[in-house]
Amino acid sequence: MKALSKIWAGALLGALLLSPALALAHGAVSHVPGNEDFGAVVGRYQFLIENKEEIVRMDGPLFLVLRVIDLDKGAPLAGARVLAAPRIPQGFRELPPPDGDKPAASTHDSHPGGSHASPPPGSFLKWGPDGRPDLRGFQAAPEGTEAGHYLVSFQPSLIGPHLLQVALLLPGKGEEPEVLLTQLPFQVRAPAGLNLRLWFSLGAALLSFVLAGYALRVRYLRPPLETAPFNLLDLPWLSRMMRSPWWQPVLQAPFLLGFALIIWLGLVDTPESSRNLSTLLMWTLWWAGVIFTFVLAGRFWCVMCPIGAAAEWTSRLSGAERQLPRRLRTLWPATALFFLLTWADGYWGIVRSPYVTAWILAAFFAAAIAMGALFARRTFCRYVCPIGGVIGLYSMIAPVELRPKSLEVCRGDADKFCYTGCEQGRGCPMFEFPQKMDSNAYCFYCGECLKTCARENLALRFRAAGKDLWTMASRRLDEAFLAVAMVAVAGMAAGHMVAPWHGWMEALTSWLPWAGLKDHALADKLTYTAVFWASAVLVPLIVYGAGSLAWRLTGRPEKTSPYKLFVRFGYAFVPLGLAMHLAHNLPHLFLEGPLAVPVFQKTVNLFTPWFIGAPDYNPSPWLEVPVLQLLQTLVLLAALLYSLYAACRLSFAQWGARTFSLRGPWPYLALILLITLANLYLLNLPMGGRHG
């Protein structure tokens, strides 16, 4: 136990010390991408290139994200007509604007007419002979999923300085619009070389095969452990704490206040997500940070979740004992809701809207309370919560578990108070029966079974991380499908944030039925919808096909089938989905997270009598980009190793004989490797932030 404690303590301390050390090694003076300058201001409007730090030379097109802010209203300018033209300065001759503020009327038809605002000195904007700005070569910039953000298609073929010329067309006094002109400089950089990282990743992937084989060899040659792992509940302070009636309320109260604050700020504060604490707390800090708890402590977040607490409190007050119909006691409702919300974020930009964020959170509270009034215990958490199924799957990776010490003692106990409850405590709120529990999927360490078990037959102990993936006896199609589909969903979430994404969607749209739509933004959204739902179905079908191939390679045994193999081997993809979520959220947490500090200052200054300093909206990141790229690569390679190992262990359990077990898993091993390499390539591409 002492050695084990030292290992865990050393790993934790090393992780805490290594992160700032790596950050300092790479320098801690650069700033969060997208916040380096104030752009250009013309009249009451501010213009900024949101993703100017992620523009690199590439073969395909990408989109410049132009943000337009109405300074009088302090909010993004939505629904405007914007024309833009990326230029290379050396290719244009500076022409001065004509004298006078009001040009003469003309029938010049190469551009919109109306009045204009002169661009700043040194402009490369051209002027027509009639004294109006020449807008030939300008393209319409459709509004993206976030209000006030306009997409300018651009082919970055040359490295060096560029200009983005912008024309904002506003309603004029007559029939012709008023034209506001400006230009924004930006640099096209050389792409960060993929060769070194790609070769490193390929080498590490091959090494993962070797390590997985070695781990299997050691696993089957070593003698079994003669002593049980140390029970953490033998620590008096931990045992008292988890058995205390205050164990859950003390953890839930701060998050209940925090979620209430998020709802309130989302409704009353600024609609700009990068200046509203609600979206930063919810999507940048909470959602990105809570995923790390799944790896370390399984479903521990659920014991703190105020939404689950609201459902359970309501159920107790109402005395509801009803259960969902048996056909609905699956993960399918939760899976459908999670996919629907993920798609809606890509379609409407939920995470970039404080108002929508507030209403979604309020809707979750309302749904949890309604289900608590109608159904027993935490029915909402077990079967309906959109992230409940995802948390359950990822919790299988956690290196801790709560299990019975002895199944014989459980079988000899006729009362089963751990499930039914008694005077000392309530039955399991997640409808788990500890005697049959063989995974972390639905246990969130609420401590109720510790209070009700008179024989003290429960142990909280460390175990091999990911052990549930290959040891649990009960496997279900809904869990296996979610495990595989999450690989596709996580990849889509990451792909939606990389710089070439809009270029890919534009190229794909040209092949789809809605290619002729004049509304470019709508066409882009329809393409995203098609790609999202197709990938959520296609990836599971590919895994099913791998199972069909494995079934044929092993001689088509009668006792199994491609369907049964899908249900068994689908769990091997859990580490890949988790790793992609972690890798995708690392930049959000460590690059966008620092913005929460000045926004918190702004919020306190605005809504309280206290002044805690002027906010600096240009904070330094918590970790530098090179460090994050290294961490992303390591996370994916670790997941590759775990998935390979899990697939091999499942293969040994499925076929037993070495001849068959070495033949059967190869389709899965090859697919796991291909998915990992695709994700590594995706994360090597420039990625933009959600909040600017």
Residue ranges of predicted features:
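Bacterial N-terminal signal peptides that target proteins for export
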Residues: 1-11
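Membrane-interface module
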Residues: 418-421
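Residue-level marker of alpha-helix boundaries and capping positions
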Residues: 27-29, 372, 440
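Membrane-embedded alpha-helical bundles of multi-pass integral membrane proteins
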Residues: 189-412, 416, 426-432, 447-451, ...
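Aromatic- and glycine-enriched pocket-lining scaffold segments that form the walls
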Residues: 441-445
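N-terminal soluble domains immediately following signal/targeting peptides that reside
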Residues: 25-203
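Bacterial N-terminal signal peptides
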Residues: 10-19
